UniProtKB/Swiss-Prot annotation:
SUPFAM superfamilies: Homeodomain-like. InterPro entries: Distal-less_Homeobox_TF, HD, Homeobox_CS, Homeodomain-like_sf. This is Oocyte-specific homeobox protein 7. It comes from the Eukaryota. Residues 40-72 have a biased composition (Polar residues). It comes from Mus musculus. One of its GO terms (cellular component) is nucleus. Residues 40-77 are annotated as: Disordered. GO terms for biological process: maternal-to-zygotic transition of gene expression. Keywords: Developmental protein, DNA-binding, Homeobox, Nucleus, Transcription, Transcription regulation. Residues 94-153 bind DNA. Specifically expressed in oocytes and early embryos.
Length: 218
């Protein structure tokens, strides 16, 4: 048989190289495969699925998986706590309500207040029936009115204190005696020495005063 055209020696070598490399590659992979498997983490179907998902999809899956656990961690409010809160709100609303008395009712209450600021239980019940309110409201009115009158009395006392201080100061100035009598000139132009008042002592006069007193007596 006729042989085909012979290739150049360089081309023949080049064509043989891939065959040798391809024959060597599987052998090297077979040698290194146990080492790579020991170094690389275990690959599971779930991990491959997670790696194939994008980042937003992973976050969404994590939130969905964590959602039930968070909801299960929240404890429902007890009935006692709910009843307590509703009771507090009801008491606050009740406190805000204020009874407005008419002029006639105020006159009646004021009349009894002027008679007695601390009425007895029987009187409180009668007033509550007359006005149409509860006993607690009557007691509260008397209590508030007593506090108002005490405050008014304190203000009157404070206003009266400065006036009393001024009058006492004027009295003290008018009754204040100096330690010595001022010098008085006599008829002939000679000055007379003043007498001094010592503590727990009798007034002392000089000779000229004694002589003038003696002449006056004569």
């Amino acid at each position: 048989m006729a042989e085909g055209p012979s290739l150049h020696p360089k081309l023949q070598v080049a064509s043989n190289i891939p065959i040798e490399i391809s024959s060597q590659i599987p052998q090297e992979l077979a040698k290194n495969l146990p080492f790579q498997m020991s170094q690389s983490p275990l690959v599971t179907p779930g991990s491959t699925m997670q790696s194939s998902l994008s980042v937003p999809e992973r976050n969404l899956l994590q939130q969905e998986s964590e959602g039930p656990s968070r909801q299960s961690g929240c404890m429902p409010l007890s009935d006692k706590y709910v009843n307590k809160q509703t009771g507090l709100l009801a008491s606050r609303n009740f406190r805000k309500e204020r009874i407005v008395y008419s002029k006639e009712q105020q006159r009646l209450l004021q009349k009894h207040f002027d008679e007695c600021q601390y009425p007895k239980e029987k009187k409180i019940v009668e007033l509550a029936v007359l006005i149409g309110v509860t006993k607690m409201e009557i007691k509260k009115w008397f209590k508030n009115n007593r506090a108002k009158y005490r405050q008014m009395n304190l203000q009157n006392i404070k206003q009266a204190l400065p006036e009393s201080n001024g009058s006492s100061k004027a009295v003290s100035e008018s009754t204040h005696f100096p330690g010595s009598i001022p010098v008085v000139a006599s008829d002939n132009g000679e000055s007379i020495c003043s007498g001094t008042f010592g503590e727990d002592s009798i007034p002392k006069f000089n000779c000229s005063q004694e002589s003038s007193l003696y002449c006056f007596q004569a």
